[in-house]
Amino acid sequence: MNQIITLAGRQEKNDDEPPDPSAISGNISLDEISKIFGLPKASLKQICDKYPARISKYYFSLIKEKGDGIYKQCIPSEAEILDTFGEEDPLREESKIIEGVPSLITHRYPDRALFRISNSCAMYCRFCTRKRKVGDPNKKPTWKEIEKALSYIQKHSEIRDVILSGGDPFMLPDELLEKILKEVYLIISKRENGIIRIGTRVPCVFPQRITSNLCAMLKRYHPLYINTHFNHPAEITPESRKACGMLADAGIPMGNQTVLLKGVNDNPETMKKLMQGLVSMRVKPYYIYQCDPIKGANHFRTKVEKGLEIYKSLRGHTSGLCVPNFVIDAPGGGGKIPLLPGYLQTIDDKKVVLKNYENKLFEYIQPD
């Protein structure tokens, strides 16, 4: 395990330059992290031996104080190795492999497939649903595995929507990313209403990676969508606004997938500020996820009622554009299941009784 973690200040760079590798490879030791935050060195080493840590210089600079919403997302915690509740793979991405489906593909829904093209990220989030494998050099996708996945997509004509995921696809060099993207595009563009999506946290944790060259390349493969991952208002900065603006100016619609995290964003005001900030930089709030029961992340989980409370605090109290779906990705591979507060009170052949955001009741008369 690489025990070096990147910690330093924010940087400006030329949009046409490739990202500086030093921004994501290590240059500060666990000794220094221990000293900065007053954390036991032996404990840090034990955590990082099991769950690798990586923090971009930029993201570290957003920490204002120990224990804040940025700190909790990126700094290793002893709670990770004390967790006895969770599962390594609660969504059954690997432990329930379907015969004939390549290891890099999850084909859970009829017309969609998830394609994991990287196992590296600019930052290893402490609550990651794939923390069992992200950052492990032995689990880096090979080109042979990628070819098998492409062949699967080609053979399954029902797939019209491919989500490139990881890890983080934007951690690949532009040339390799385009090579994979082009192969997927050649298949999907021939299918009715075919689209490609990319899931990435780069605009949030390493926005310097979004360059004009990258955006120019992505523009060649429309219709292309990006799902970002912002979890706290402090992540919305001039740098992340610039990165998202460049992607939006390239004609790429963006959605955001937030994870509900205890001590990070589990209150209505924080979540409302985040959702409004996202919309202001042309990113549509898409999902709020109930935190998955991943081994090593139980300390991040809230009660489901907390998510419903937050959803209810958004609906009617801010513009509809700012209200995402609240979902649980069902353990055991059941897929995303949306949850709603009790707006529908009763329903029969004659009428429907509804409750609005002010808890007032209204009747809707059914047609004969």
Residues covered by each model-derived region:
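N-terminal pre-triad scaffold of radical SAM enzymes
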Residues: 52-55, 101-129
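Conserved, mostly hydrophobic/aromatic
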Residues: 59, 125, 286
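Conserved catalytic-core segments centered on acid/base and nucleophilic motifs
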Residues: 115-116, 128, 162-164, 169-170, ...
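Iron-sulfur (Fe-S) cluster-binding segments and ferredoxin-like electron-carrier domains
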Residues: 128-140
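C-terminal accessory regions of radical SAM enzymes
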Residues: 309-368
